[in-house]
């Protein structure tokens, strides 16, 4: 049976360097290599900083994916191999943000959209993967609309920015000084740059690093020794250097407050602390440290875990609907082919009738139209009940019944494989491979002749 299978290398089992070593070449190369495998009918590749995932539609999924894992040089201990049902559930969980390092993050949904669109444009997807990925994107949106799984701050850096917004009622027109251009400092600066602030100043021990970040964000670089001169103009100071001593002392803050009446918010995200604790005693100063931010972050994580339960319920509901959709698609394929065959007979027999009548009488447009309507109506009425029965059987999962109908009426004779050989593979073989093209043509002709003989035998 041709279904979806997948292999997943993610942050859950693999280190960053292991994921990087498993990824060779560009996306085009991997997609092309996958799609031109004899037993791969459709494929999509998802590649982000935290995962490499391959989805294929194949009648020999296990052997195909194991061979690709070996080809990629990836150790099987860092890979999860999923069958059809597991692949669908994983994909929907991924789109919903449940598989991310930070539960509920939004970036993954955009990445799925972009990478699916890339594969679709490359021509490596078909009805089965299109249905799965379109459903995943829809579910990702639904989860974010119906739950609060992506709300609140879960990192210390984002919590610092949210806290500043809460205290001031927004950061519009505020001047912010960020001290420290390490990982957290950069994240804070980037989050601040998205706000409508008046100015952002980046101070760092290595001035060149401060200049690079400031240039990227449209801010101003400050030497660490010069921060004293910038404190009087700052509304918010966020410090996270990790230095073994205080960066901001009480004496420095008192000097900055001289002649000033507006509030100064100090947020210390360093460990050990960058700001002397006694500054909290000063008027018009509010000091928050990493412990305050951790409480906000943990509260958000707890909330997101609760929201994840709601997301799980949505996913289970959508998987049920997706399986019904796949079952209907199988019935629709059979019904479409059945109608096509019967309509071919209808057209041929109608033409015979018109020719016979024309031998004895003059047949005009009205008579021809009556015959056309008559045969059309007969076909539709004969097939109405079988159509209903086929759809019901599909929704009930009665695969055996569908297979019997398919064999009796010769509706599916390895159709997907013939189409793949005939269209995709032949058309995409590189120029100059005349022998390969001839071989494909010969294989296709042999198989098509076998199909015609099979149809003729059944009709006889």
UniProtKB/Swiss-Prot annotation:
NADP(+) binds at residues 180-185. One of its GO terms (biological process) is protoporphyrinogen IX biosynthetic process from glutamate. GO terms for molecular function: glutamyl-tRNA reductase activity; NADP binding. Pathway: Porphyrin-containing compound metabolism; protoporphyrin-IX biosynthesis; 5-aminolevulinate from L-glutamyl-tRNA(Glu): step 1/2. Substrate binds at residues 48-51, 100, 105-107, 111. Keywords: NADP, Oxidoreductase, Porphyrin biosynthesis. The record marks 90 as: Important for activity. It catalyses: (S)-4-amino-5-oxopentanoate + tRNA(Glu) + NADP(+) = L-glutamyl-tRNA(Glu) + NADPH + H(+). The active site is at 49 (nucleophile). Gene3D superfamilies: Glutamyl-tRNA reductase, N-terminal domain, NAD(P)-binding Rossmann-like Domain. Its EC number is 1.2.1.70. InterPro entries: 4pyrrol_synth_GluRdtase, 4pyrrol_synth_GluRdtase_dimer, 4pyrrol_synth_GluRdtase_N, GluRdtase_CS, GluRdtase_dimer_dom_sf, GluRdtase_N_sf, NAD(P)-bd_dom_sf, Shikm_DH/Glu-tRNA_Rdtase. It is an enzyme of class 1 (oxidoreductase). The keyword NADP applies. During catalysis, the active site Cys acts as a nucleophile attacking the alpha-carbonyl group of tRNA-bound glutamate with the formation of a thioester intermediate between enzyme and glutamate, and the concomitant release of tRNA(Glu). The thioester intermediate is finally reduced by direct hydride transfer from NADPH, to form the product GSA. Homodimer. Belongs to the glutamyl-tRNA reductase family. Catalyzes the NADPH-dependent reduction of glutamyl-tRNA(Glu) to glutamate 1-semialdehyde (GSA). Possesses an unusual extended V-shaped dimeric structure with each monomer consisting of three distinct domains arranged along a curved 'spinal' alpha-helix. The N-terminal catalytic domain specifically recognizes the glutamate moiety of the substrate. The second domain is the NADPH-binding domain, and the third C-terminal domain is responsible for dimerization. This is Glutamyl-tRNA reductase. It comes from Methanosarcina acetivorans (strain ATCC 35395 / DSM 2834 / JCM 12185 / C2A). The gene is hemA.
């Amino acid at each position: 049976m041709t279904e979806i299978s997948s292999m997943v290398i993610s942050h859950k089992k693999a280190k960053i360097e292991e994921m990087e070593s498993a990824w060779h070449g560009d996306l085009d190369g991997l997609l092309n290599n996958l799609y031109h495998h004899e037993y791969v009918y459709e494929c999509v590749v998802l590649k982000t900083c935290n995962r490499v995932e391959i989805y294929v539609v194949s009648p020999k999924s296990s052997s195909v994916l194991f061979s690709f894992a070996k080809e990629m040089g990836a150790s099987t201990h860092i890979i999860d191999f999923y069958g059809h049902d597991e692949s669908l559930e994983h994909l929907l969980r991924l789109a919903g943000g449940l598989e991310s390092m930070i539960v509920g993050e939004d970036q993954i949904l955009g990445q799925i959209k972009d990478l699916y669109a890339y594969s679709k444009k490359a021509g490596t997807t078909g009805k089965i993967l299109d249905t799965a990925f379109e459903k995943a994107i829809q579910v990702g949106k639904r989860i974010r609309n119906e739950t609060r799984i992506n709300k609140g701050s879960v990192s210390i850096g984002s919590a610092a920015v949210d806290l500043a917004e809460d205290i001031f009622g927004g950061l519009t027109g505020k001047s912010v000084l960020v001290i420290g251009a390490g990982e957290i400092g950069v994240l804070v600066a980037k989050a601040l740059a998205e706000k409508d602030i008046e100015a952002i100043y980046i101070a760092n021990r290595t001035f060149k690093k401060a200049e690079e970040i400031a240039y990227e964000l449209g801010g101003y670089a400050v030497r660490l020794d010069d921060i004293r001169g910038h404190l009087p103009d700052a509304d918010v100071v966020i410090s996270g250097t990790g230095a073994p001593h205080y960066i901001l002392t009480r004496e420095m803050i008192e000097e900055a407050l001289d002649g000033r009446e507006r509030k100064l918010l100090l947020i210390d995200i360093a460990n050990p602390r960058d700001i002397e604790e006694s500054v909290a005693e000063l008027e018009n100063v509010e000091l928050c440290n990493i412990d305050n931010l951790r409480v906000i972050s943990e509260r958000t994580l707890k909330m997101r875990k609760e929201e994840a339960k709601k997301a799980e319920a949505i996913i289970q509901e959508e998987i049920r609907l997706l399986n019904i959709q796949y079952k209907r698609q199988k019935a629709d394929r059979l019904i479409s082919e059945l109608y096509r065959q019967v309509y071919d007979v209808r057209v041929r027999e109608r033409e015979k009738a018109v020719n016979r009548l024309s031998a004895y009488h003059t047949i005009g447009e009205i008579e021809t139209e009556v015959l056309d309507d008559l045969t059309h109506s007969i076909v539709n009425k004969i097939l109405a009940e079988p159509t209903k029965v086929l759809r019901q059987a599909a929704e009930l999962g009665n695969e055996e019944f569908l297979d019997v109908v398919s064999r009796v009426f010769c509706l599916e004779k390895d159709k997907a494989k013939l189409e793949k050989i005939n269209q995709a593979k032949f058309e995409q073989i590189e120029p100059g491979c005349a022998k390969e093209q001839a071989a494909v043509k010969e294989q296709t002709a042999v198989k098509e002749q076998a199909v015609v003989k099979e149809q003729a035998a059944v009709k006889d």
